[in-house]
Amino acid sequence: NMILAQSFICKCDESVPFPAEYISEVTDYLFSVEEWKIYELILIGNLYLFFDIPLLHKMGQEIGSQVSRTGANKRLVIITLLNIWETCLHRDELTAAAYYRDSILPLTADETLLYERNLYHFLSGLHRFKSGEKESGLREMRQAIQIYKWLGCENLARNYKKDLHK
């Protein structure tokens, strides 16, 4: 819990670094647990920004493998994987990002997962854009932003519009 509290402090004040020993402690813990449940997913979901891509990708692959075995906490799994994908894209790690593009889509087949499906659409556009398909990538991201607007999700639309202009 102290580690989670520290992560919130670091996210609020970027001048406060996240302690490297916490990353080691969390990593040791996660890879000592046989099955990741809701606590472990929440832990990763709150700390993913502090992990380097090789470690984050290893965690993402483990999450993907566990959901295919158990199907538990599916919505939290999808959100966590989407966040990892977005992080890979923002850090220009397109090879790792491709893993998430390909593995998340089958998880979002349920039509009631509107937020997750639209975020997938946005990230797919960002992935295209970062891969050199600038025009089609921008079009896809703008479509996702428009969908948020149509659904009355103005804050989401505004947040992703900021992402679009980065």
What are these regions (language model features)?
Residues 1-28:
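Hydrophobic alpha-helical segments and helix pairs
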Residues 40-114:
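Alpha-helical adaptor scaffolds
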Residues 25-31, 64-69, 101-110, 142-153:
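Amphipathic alpha-helical segments of tetratricopeptide repeats
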Residues 3-10, 42-46, 79, 83-87, ...:
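"A position-specific structural signal for the A-helix of alpha-solenoid helical repeats
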